[in-house]
Amino acid sequence: MTTITAPVKRVPIPDEASAPFFDGALHGELMLLRCQACGTYQSPIAYIGVPLRARCVTCFSGELVWAPSSGNATLYSFVLMHQLYDEAFAAEIPYNIAVVETDEGVRMTSQVVDCPNERLEIGMPLEVTFERMSDAVAVPKFRPRA
């Protein structure tokens, strides 16, 4: 007898550079990079995999440290996906892909959850939540702020 298994969503594989981001997510904290020289927060995603060359986007300092964010954000932009590109998402069609802007000024791609797509509005206040994808990985998503 053949067993048919459902498609599984791809799970990010943390590396040395991204470990603080994913460790924070496992503990319920959204971690961002913060420049010690000028205080600018920036997205960690642009630097995952290239920690030795990471520079501040504002002053070009190499003094970047991981810091917890407030977890608050606003919806900057979004698109609704009606076409199936990955079988693992079949049960979620249509789903949203969102760009959120954290209170620290960092824009990141994520998803708004716990909200019908029809109620999504640019500028709506959001708060971070985390989807546990495995024992070792959780990813940030956002929901309407209470």
What are these model-predicted stretches?
Residues 1-34, 146:
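A broadly conserved sequence feature marking short terminus-proximal activation segments
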Residues 3, 105-146:
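Well-ordered alpha/beta subsegment
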Residues 29-32, 39-40, 50-53:
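Residues immediately within or flanking Cys/His clusters that coordinate Zn2+
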Residues 32, 97-99, 141:
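Conserved hydrophobic/aromatic beta-strand scaffold that supports enzyme active sites
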Residues 34-37, 55-61:
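Short, cysteine/histidine-rich loop/knuckle motifs that typically chelate Zn2+
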Residues 43, 47, 61-65:
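Short functional micro-motifs and their immediate structural scaffolds
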Residues 63-119:
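Extended interfacial segments that mediate partner engagement and assembly in macromolecular machines
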